[in-house]
Regions:
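Amphipathic alpha-helical interaction surfaces in cytosolic regulatory modules
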Residues: 27-105
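Short secondary-structure boundary/capping segments
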Residues: 2-3, 12-14, 75, 97
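Short, charge-rich amphipathic segments
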Residues: 1-9, 48-51
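Short acidic-hydrophobic, aromatic-tinged amphipathic segments that line or gate anion-handling sites
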Residues: 106-110
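A charged, well-structured terminal subsegment
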Residues: 112-117
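STAS-typified acidic loop motif
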Residues: 4, 9-38
Length: 117
């Protein structure tokens, strides 16, 4: 039996001190990337010390999802708020490597390591 994949991402935000952790579940593509981007920018508006985006439950992301993360990164740099990505699944990690964005983003194996920085 094929496992159902969450088609629309669900983002849950929790706070670890001054650090915001955004845990995302589901695929991120053109049909939902605008909503995803809005959620990320709303977290930035709360002025966290850092933002960690937990992508461990995201099996697929297309270029629109990456564009949302790039927009967050651009705005966060202006606000001096570090953005870290954590838990990228193999398929998503490959996308970041192919586009060389693994050299642009801080990427960690899991949230614990990202928060330790």
């Amino acid at each position: 039996m094929k496992k159902d994949v969450q088609k629309r991402p669900i983002a849950a935000v929790r706070w670890e001190g001054q650090a915001a952790v955004v845990s995302v579940t589901g695929e991120i593509d053109l049909s939902c990337s605008g909503e995803f981007q809005d959620e990320l920018l709303d977290v930035l508006d709360d002025k966290p010390g850092s933002i960690t985006v937990d992508l461990s439950n995201v099996p697929h992301m297309d270029s629109s999802g990456i564009a949302s993360l790039i927009k967050l990164l651009g705005r966060s740099r202006k606000a001096s708020v570090p953005v870290r990505l954590a838990g990228l699944q193999k398929r998503v990690q490959s996308l970041f490597e192919i586009t060389r964005l693994d050299k642009v983003f801080e990427i960690y194996p899991d949230v614990t390591e990202a928060l330790a920085k």
